Structure formats: C-alpha cells, structure tokens
C-alpha cells in the first residue's frame, strides 16, 4: 500500500498517469487478494498452532502446501495479465472517454504489474511464516528496504521513462522483497522446500506456460471483438478467461500439479 501511495504521488507529475496506474492496479489487486492475501490469512492460525506445539513436520507440510497453492494461482494469472494486458484493459474500461491512448498506457502498466504478481503472493505467504513464529520485525524492516528501493528507482528513472517506471520499480522491489524474505527464512531455519513441492512446482510452471499459449491463441482469435466490439467485448473477455481457466485446471489435474484437496489447506 505504501508503494502504491508513493507511486501515485510520483505519477501525478505526468498528465493522466495516475489514472493509468489506478486502472491497472485495480485488476492485479484482485488477483493478489486471491493468490496471496487470502492464503496467508487462512494458514496463519494453523501455523501458529503447530509452531506453539513444536510440530516441525506439520509446519513444513503447511508451509509447502501454502506456497504451492499461491504459485498455482499466481503464476498463470501473471502470464495471462502479461499476455492479454491490452485486451483486458480494453474490454473492462475501454468505453466512452477512455481513449485508445489510455487503454495502451494502462495496459503497459498492467503488463509490468503482472510480472510482479508471483512476488506479491510470495511476500504475503513468506510474511505469514514469520508472523506465525512471532517475528514481525524482520518482514517489517525488509519491507522498509523494499519501499526505499522502489522510491529510489521511481524517482531516479522517472525523467527518462515516465510513469511506466512506477510499475517496473514496484515489480523489481517486490521481487527483491520476496527473495530477501526467503533468505532470512532459510537463515533462521524457519522454512525449507520438500520434495513434493519441488515436483509440483515444475508441473505448475509447465501447466502455466501451456495455459499462456492457449490464452494467447484465444486473445488473438478474439482480438477484434476484445478491442473494438463496443457492446460485447466484456463478454468475449469473460469467455476467454473461462476457457483459459478450464484448460489450466484440466491440464493441472491431468499431470497431477493440483488436487482438489490442496485447496482446503487443512492438515
């Protein structure tokens, strides 16, 4: 939220830039809420319980399953947002006084925000691992460093790149945040990957890439409708997203990257 506030202030120095960022932000925040925030909220009570009971095996299972689910949700969303950013913005907001230039610039912002979506999800999940161990200081100080990096990049490169440096800086600082959180978790011996996660993670990557190719085909197939069909383009977007989701879900089930039980997060 601090990054968004800082980005908005800096973007106000360029005409219409605040609006471009606002519309892009609304879309990726929905995905973030599903892929990261919700999972973090659900697993915190369970993790805290088993940390108190010192059941390391249970803790490891919950951590890896939570990370697995966050990647299962955020990776395909990141790919879809990056591939279809212009069509998504056009279908949702490209009406009335929202010009083609506004669609193009908002889509560019969404593209770079989309690249950072897995990092945003990782931050929420990794932070929960610290909170369950009654450590709020470490993620707080790492977040401050990340915000400082974001501000520096945004201010230093704003004159050269304009408003688009803001989502780029946000994504870079978010990946920095997630990587540093992971390093501290490992150093404090609060987390480790298990074999099941590593196997499923590569399956999730494969399924996400295949979904991305399929979604790209849909976006190109319906491109004219998504960009120019004033009355029905939102329906074409819903249909494309639905088909992409079904394709991803079925492929994930087929290659055993995902099971129905995984979504329950109860162990």
Where would I find each of the regions flagged by the language model?
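Interfacial/gating helices of multi-pass transporter permease domains
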Residues: 9-31, 101-107, 239-240
């Amino acid at each position: 939220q601090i990054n968004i506030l800082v980005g908005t202030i800096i973007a106000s120095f360029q005409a219409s830039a605040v609006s471009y960022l606002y519309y892009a932000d609304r879309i990726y925040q929905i995905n973030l809420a599903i892929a990261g925030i919700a999972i973090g909220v659900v697993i915190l009570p369970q993790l805290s319980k088993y940390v108190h009971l010192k059941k390391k095996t249970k803790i490891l299972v919950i951590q890896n399953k939570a990370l697995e689910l966050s990647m299962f949700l955020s990776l395909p969303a990141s790919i879809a947002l990056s591939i279809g950013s212009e069509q998504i913005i056009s279908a949702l907001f490209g009406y009335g006084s929202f010009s083609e230039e506004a669609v193009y610039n908002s889509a560019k912002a969404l593209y770079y925000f989309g690249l950072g979506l897995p990092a945003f999800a990782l931050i929420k999940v990794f932070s929960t691992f610290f909170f369950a161990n009654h450590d709020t200081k470490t993620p707080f100080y790492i977040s401050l460093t990340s915000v400082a990096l974001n501000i520096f990049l945004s201010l230093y490169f704003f004159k050269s790149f304009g408003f688009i440096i803001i989502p780029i800086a946000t994504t870079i600082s978010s990946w920095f945040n997630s990587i540093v959180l992971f390093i501290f978790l490992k150093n404090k011996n609060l987390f480790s990957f298990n074999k099941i996660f590593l196997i499923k993670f590569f399956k999730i990557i494969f399924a996400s890439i295949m979904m991305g190719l399929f979604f790209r085909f849909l976006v190109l197939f319906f491109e004219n409708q998504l960009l120019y069909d004033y009355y029905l383009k939102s329906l074409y977007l819903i249909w494309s997203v639905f088909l992409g989701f079904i394709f991803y879900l079925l492929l994930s089930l087929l290659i055993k990257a995902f099971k129905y039980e995984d979504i329950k997060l109860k162990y």
